[in-house]
Regions:
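N-terminal subdomain of nucleotide-sugar transferases
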Residues: 1-75, 228, 280, 436-442
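A conserved catalytic-core segment of Leloir-type glycosyltransferases
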Residues: 42-126
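Acidic donor-binding loop of glycosyltransferase active sites
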Residues: 207, 315-317, 331-348
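Carbohydrate-associated surface elements
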Residues: 215, 234
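Nucleotide-activated donor-binding/catalytic signature segment of Leloir-type glycosyltransferases, i.e.
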Residues: 290-297, 302-328
């Protein structure tokens, strides 16, 4: 079967784990069935906060994977922190995410914000463009896709499109200058102007732009004449092929599992929820006996401390990073899935990747964040759960009580609406249709 070829420039690729990997691994998995051969360009030695070798099985045999070494400033940063006596946890946390920054971390933030533009992967831009120009001369493709962050991937895509004349899609998994941590990077005014100029250059230079959230799509469309498409993240039906766990619907002899999967950052710590659970445990011995707080993925130590300080240490199960399939199993066994957003105004526009796998788990979802944000719209539309403000203690108590009562009766179900539009197969079909439009000959 003849297939067109698409070059996908992505920093994240298996065996690296995490949500940043899964979007384009899943697209690559299903693109061949839509007539497209994926050619992935990715670093040989990326920074890996999580490793999930199981994702390598998702990459189709027809895919071509090109790997080149990258200079990683974060490795030098970690060595300096270790030598200065920082804890293992502090060393592993990106300085952007560190809450109580040491002087060394503050210096690292300034260096990262002003000397590495647009991000610490900028040292890969020039070598990548030179390598890919030579590669494409010998192995032509029909289309280029860059996916960011890191935004350096878009800089590679921009220069490559300019020098080859190929159509190019800039896929934004997160915004650029409107991402929550942008304002924390301690940039000079000149650096901030440079970022806004380059963001505009990428948006205008792309043949098409893809956003994963409707609010980000709208924001980008006000900034450029380039068409901005909405193609969200999603769930892979193959990951959910087994029958739902019967125990997940509850019963008086079954544990009441409140589960969070993925990165759990300190600035998304739902302290009010821990207070609600603590008070209910004190008032209801049966609830205390059956409550399990399951945390899967990288969890900030401040969150673990907050849970223990609330008297919930015996109920806590900190499982760490699990392979994707095991994480999904735990989601499906949950009584309640929690999705606290970071306490940043920019998160109103965010649709976390885990949201869609939460939907496919058919469990009730308690979101904590802006009640008028993008995530709230999805949960309302699918009737899969609710989003409450961070400090709305009474509403959280009522929702936990409601889920607990349904759990005891074995009636705990969720996601009544249609979620088929979020399946990876349907999303890949839409992406392939965009590919076809951009490469159609007049």
């Amino acid at each position: 079967m003849f297939m067109k070829r698409v070059l996908i420039i992505s920093y994240y690729w298996p065996p690296t784990g995490g949500s940043g990997v899964q979007r384009w691994v899943k697209f690559a998995k299903y693109l061949p069935s839509e007539g497209w051969q994926p050619v992935i360009y990715t670093p040989e030695n990326p920074e890996q906060l999580a490793v999930d070798a199981s994702l390598e099985a998702e990459v189709p045999a027809v895919a071509e994977v090109l790997k080149r070494r990258i200079v990683e400033p974060y490795e030098l940063y970690k060595k300096v922190l270790r030598r200065s006596g920082h804890s293992k946890e502090a060393v592993e946390v990106n300085p952007v995410n560190a809450q109580n920054k040491s002087m060394l971390q503050k210096i690292a933030m300034w260096v990262r914000g002003n000397l590495f533009r647009p991000d610490p992967r900028c040292l890969w831009i020039g070598p990548s463009v030179r390598y890919l120009k030579k590669y494409l001369a010998e192995h032509p493709v029909d289309l280029i896709v860059s996916t960011g962050p890191p935004q350096s991937m878009h800089m590679i895509g921009l220069r490559l499109a300019q020098e080859t004349g190929l159509p190019w899609i800039a896929d934004f998994r997160d915004p650029w200058t409107k991402i929550f941590y942008f304002k924390h990077l301690q940039m000079t005014r000149a650096t901030e102007r440079w970022h806004k100029k380059m963001e505009k250059k990428v948006l205008d230079g792309a043949t098409a732009v893809v956003a994963v959230s409707p609010l980000v799509q709208q924001e980008f469309q006000t900034m450029t004449q380039t068409p901005v498409e909405l193609i969200t993240n999603g769930f892979d039906e193959c990951d959910f092929h087994a029958e739902p766990f019967a125990m997940a619907y509850g019963g008086p002899a079954i544990d009441f599992c409140i589960t969070h999967t993925g990165l759990f950052a300190a600035d998304g710590n739902p302290t009010v929820l821990w207070d609600v659970l603590s008070e209910k445990c004190k008032a209801d011995a049966e609830f205390r006996k059956h409550l399990k707080i399951n945390l899967i993925g990288k969890t900030d130590e401040q969150i673990l401390k907050a849970i223990c300080d609330a008297g919930l240490e015996e109920n806590l199960m900190n499982m760490g990073y699990l392979e994707h399939a095991r994480a999904i199993d735990e989601q499906r066994k949950a009584s309640l899935l929690i999705l606290p957003l970071r306490k940043e105004p920019e998160y109103k526009a965010v649709l976390p990747g885990k949201l869609f796998e939460y939907l496919a788990s058919w469990r009730p979802v308690l979101g904590i964040g802006q009640t008028d944000g993008a995530m709230s719209m999805i949960l309302q539309d699918t009737k899969a759960g609710i989003v409450l403000e961070w400090e709305d203690k009474d509403a959280m108590r009522r929702y936990v009580d409601e889920c607990w009562e349904k759990h005891l009766k074995g009636e705990l179900k969720a996601t009544e609406g249609d979620i088929s539009r979020f399946s990876r197969i349907n999303l890949t079909r839409r992406m392939a249709q965009l590919f076809d439009r951009l490469t159609a000959h007049p």
